Curated annotation (Swiss-Prot):
It is an enzyme of class 2 (transferase). One of its GO terms (molecular function) is nucleic acid binding. It comes from Caenorhabditis elegans. It catalyses: a 2'-deoxyadenosine in DNA + S-adenosyl-L-methionine = an N(6)-methyl-2'-deoxyadenosine in DNA + S-adenosyl-L-homocysteine + H(+). Its EC number is 2.1.1.72. This is DNA N6-methyl methyltransferase. Methylates DNA on the 6th position of adenine (N(6)-methyladenosine). N(6)-methyladenosine (m6A) DNA is involved in epigenetic transgenerational inheritance. Keywords: Methyltransferase, S-adenosyl-L-methionine, Transferase.
Length: 365
């Protein structure tokens, strides 16, 4: 951890969460050994040793220039600390992409009219016992100090972090749940389904920002809560989010960048990519305007991570925030597709990435 940046190891984080079950994350999900590119471009580079696309004069924004300089610094430090691998596997991340396809090949029950009831289990539970007419409308909690297991009708196992609570359904259901249980959250992390012409998630939310405008975020927050929103690199989106925070009576305290890197420490995209794909995403952090709590957060922090090969998955942030002295007792993740310990997670696919297709037995233990 540097004052300007950090290098996260998401794989090790999940391994630590499920150590009690003798599980580890499937390492191939993180075998991002080369930059992201179409197979045709990769084959051309492999044959000729050069890219097959014509480069225009390099045009990068001030933001990209800063990130490019930071990427060099991160690679140098990571190499010196022997964090990064020296050799890459020349398969255009094929093994990792196949692992992602397998990881997503699971069935998540449909949501029905939301209930505020919490069903608790500890060691193991059958998915059928959590469902009604083939759908889930309750909130499910793994109440033990160790991870639990949910098994569906075909024998597929889902591994649930300790003291985590999840709900399959619309994120707006959290408002009714919050009122029913007199529960406010002191940390909210959200990864909304921002509209994209090139990528559309499996049927989940409307692919626009209307779902955000329907959320009444302030009513589920404690007075001194911190909120963290992932945003895309679409032009104007940061300004839109600032306006939305203002509507919620909140102000931005910092904007961080996630730099996505290969196992060798290189950015997964070129900074002058003609298709406007860049190797970083932004995380906006905000608090209530009338809160007197001071968050000692660097304004322009960068954290680098080898991404899981599942599209749009973001690294867990709890330990990173704790490093900066952020104390929280009731964290909430909106639009969740994976679960975290002692955290409420809400979305149409909250335990998508908890299946046995993501984890395997840790034979080293």
């Amino acid at each position: 951890m540097d004052t300007e940046f950090a290098i996260l190891d998401e794989e090790k984080y999940y391994d630590s969460v499920f150590k009690e079950l003798n599980l580890k994350t499937r390492s191939e999900l993180y075998e991002i050994s080369s930059k992201f590119m179409p197979d045709s471009q990769f084959e051309a580079i492999k044959r000729r040793g050069i890219s097959n696309r014509k480069r225009k004069i390099k045009e990068t924004s001030e933001n990209s220039n800063r990130m490019e300089q930071m990427a060099l610094k991160i690679k140098n430090v990571g190499t010196e600390l022997k964090i990064f691998k020296k050799k890459s596997i020349l398969d255009n991340n094929l093994k990792s992409r196949k692992a992602a396809e397998t990881a997503l090949n699971v069935s998540i029950p449909s949501a029905s009219a939301s209930s505020e009831q919490i069903i608790e289990f500890q060691k193991s539970e059958s998915l059928s016992n959590l469902m009604s007419n083939g759908m889930i409308n309750n909130w499910v909690r793994c109440s033990g100090d160790k991870p639990g297991i949910i098994e569906n009708s075909d024998g597929t196992k889902f591994y649930i972090p300790p003291k985590s609570t999840f709900h399959v359904g619309d994120v707006k259901d959290i408002e009714q749940y919050s009122r029913a249980h007199d529960l406010l959250f002191d940390l909210i992390i959200a990864d909304p389904p921002w509209f994209s012409k090139s990528v559309k998630r499996k049927r989940t939310y409307q692919m626009d920002e209307e779902v955000l405008d329907c959320l009444d975020i302030p009513v589920i927050l404690t007075h001194d809560a911190l909120i963290a929103f992932w945003i895309t690199n679409r032009i104007g989106i940061e300004e839109e989010m600032i306006e939305r925070f203002d509507k919620w009576g909140m102000e931005v305290v910092a904007t961080w960048k996630l730099l996505k890197i290969t196992t060798q420490g290189d950015p997964v995209y070129d900074f002058d990519n003609q298709k406007h794909k860049v190797p970083f995403e932004s995380l906006m952090l905000a608090k209530k305007k009338d809160s007197m709590r001071k968050f000692e957060l660097p304004e322009n922090f960068v954290f680098a991570s080898v991404p899981m090969s599942v599209h749009s998955h973001k690294p867990p942030l709890l330990d990173l925030l704790r490093h900066f002295g952020i104390e929280f007792t009731e964290p909430l993740e909106l639009f969740a597709r994976s679960l975290l310990p002692s955290t409420h997670s809400v979305g149409y696919e909250p335990f998508l990435l908890q299946s046995e297709h993501v984890f395997t037995r840790n034979i080293s233990l």
